[in-house]
Amino acid sequence: MEDRMVSASYKNEDFDVEHSLRPEKLSEYIGQDKVKEKLSIFTKAAKMRNEALDHVLLYGPPGLGKTTLANIIAREMGGTLKVTSGPAIERPGDMAAILTSLNDYDVLFIDEIHRLNRTVEEIMYPAMEDNVLDIVIGKGAAAKSIRLDLPKFTLIGATTRVGLLTSPLRDRFGVLSAMEFYNEDELKEIILRSSKILGVVTTEEAAFEIARRSRGTPRIANRLLKRVRDYCDVKGDGVIDINIAKNALSLLEIDGEGFDKIDNKILEAIIDNFKGGPVGLETLAYFIGEELDTIQDVYEPYLLQKGFIVRMPRGRKATEKAYRHLKREFKEQTKLT
């Protein structure tokens, strides 16, 4: 999975390009209009009252701009962004150290917040509700509890699996926002903006071609733009036009739907090996040699959103659209029931 060009999961190579292309204001942020409107109103209201923004939960597939929004919020609130992840915070003491290092209006961004362990999560409750940290010093009969005041901070949690959050944690977020896949026009705008920052000329037609193969995900769009730029530097004349874009994307083996070999392997398995489905995700993951979480978090959301598979009580089933994509005959008995 790490080598997939169209994986929305974060890669090391994404750091420099994302940092350089990242918008610094909500007004510069393309797409996610409903999320932006809410955050714009709530940040302005918080600043008018000299309060920290209420805690924010951003959920949805990876690569849609959660970290970018956290950066913008920290900048808008006049604080510093501190970034960590659920798996990285192993003990309550780790979380206590992070919380006590914050200053007023700082933003603590926790990626994969659904993976916080329960003991760590529990010390977050008073921190989120009352800006206090309860810690226990000593053991046994000599143990005593100390309450520390915390600065006015904002916790931004990000997750691809909102259903795995416990109710007590989820209920302590004042702002819950679903991040949605981007449409092709939004991605085209992102690609044209990124092209200017990178100093490369990209035609609108070429930008749209890259956009429609970017799986609705800005991270993938910017990654593909970098690879098309490489191709253009070697094979072109300095301008990314439609032919350069198509040839580069063909070389990367990304088809017109934004699918690579793995996506097509999933569809082929459902149709050719399981008669169109339904087939359980565990069985499917085993058959194609991927982890169950990878299927659920990385591949399935886009296939569902594009209408190539559907969820059924007994598993996943390929749609007529998937049959057409693979040039398979869609027989009457394979229709969805």
Swiss-Prot record:
The residues that the entry says bind DNA are 311, 316
- CDD domains xrefs: AAA
* Region spans: Small ATPAse domain (RuvB-S): 183-253
Gene3D superfamilies documented for this protein: 1.10.8.60, P-loop containing nucleotide triphosphate hydrolases, Winged helix-like DNA-binding domain superfamily/Winged helix DNA-binding domain
An annotated GO cellular component of this protein is: Holliday junction resolvase complex
Q: Where are the transmembrane segments?
A: none
Q: Where in the cell is it found?
A: Cytoplasm
Q: What class of enzyme is it?
A: hydrolase
GO biological process: one example = DNA recombination
Keyword DNA-binding tagged: yes
NCBIfam families recorded for this chain?
Answer: PRK00080.1 (NF000868), ruvB (TIGR00635)
- Say which family it is in: Belongs to the RuvB family.
Q: What does this protein do?
A: The RuvA-RuvB-RuvC complex processes Holliday junction (HJ) DNA during genetic recombination and DNA repair, while the RuvA-RuvB complex plays an important role in the rescue of blocked DNA replication forks via replication fork reversal (RFR). RuvA specifically binds to HJ cruciform DNA, conferring on it an open structure. The RuvB hexamer acts as an ATP-dependent pump, pulling dsDNA into and through the RuvAB complex. RuvB forms 2 homohexamers on either side of HJ DNA bound by 1 or 2 RuvA tetramers; 4 subunits per hexamer contact DNA at a time.
Return the protein name.
Holliday junction branch migration complex subunit RuvB
- The organism encoding this protein is Clostridium novyi (strain NT)
Taxonomic path = Bacteria, Bacillati, Bacillota, Clostridia, Eubacteriales
Q: Tell me what gene encodes this.
A: ruvB
